[in-house]
Amino acid sequence: MSSSRAMQRLCGLMRKAVQDYEMIAPGDKVMVGVSGGKDSVALTIGLAELRKYIGFDFTVQAVTLDPQFGGRPMDYTVLQELFAQYDIPYEIRRTEIGPVVFDCRKEKNPCALCAKLRRGALHTAAQELGCNKVALGHHLDDAVETFYMNLWREGRIGCFSPVTYLSRRDLTLIRPMLLATEQA
């Protein structure tokens, strides 16, 4: 499948999810946390494309939280140039997540702490930028994996929701790629 056809398919699935689960409303300001991986980049571009034909206006704001692993900032020039082509405002926020996790706390299993710190920084960035929604790049494969991990590790049936309201932050998390598989 060509990349343009793949993007059309992804946008169609995103549109269905957005409409079926009422993820985005007119005037919403949606922030996407961009790691630089394929899921977050596809989500950001997909949302920008979706603005063209969804039938109402909403804003997309891309943000990268640079964890500064190794104590050094990363170069995000490629993402800056890509998002400029789609008229997507893009901000890079340097954080101390890497040094805190590895130098201060010296975690043996740093993933949980790193994820918690990133979530907090992401929610703070959304609030500071005046965003009312945070779009996450979880897709159908992630939902299936989460379902089975909960079943096997915790003995319970459960998964994340397409839309989650965080009352303490007054933010809504949305997962527009939920109907798409990783191959979609």
Model-based region annotation:
Residues 159-183:
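Short, flexible loop segments at boundaries between secondary-structure elements
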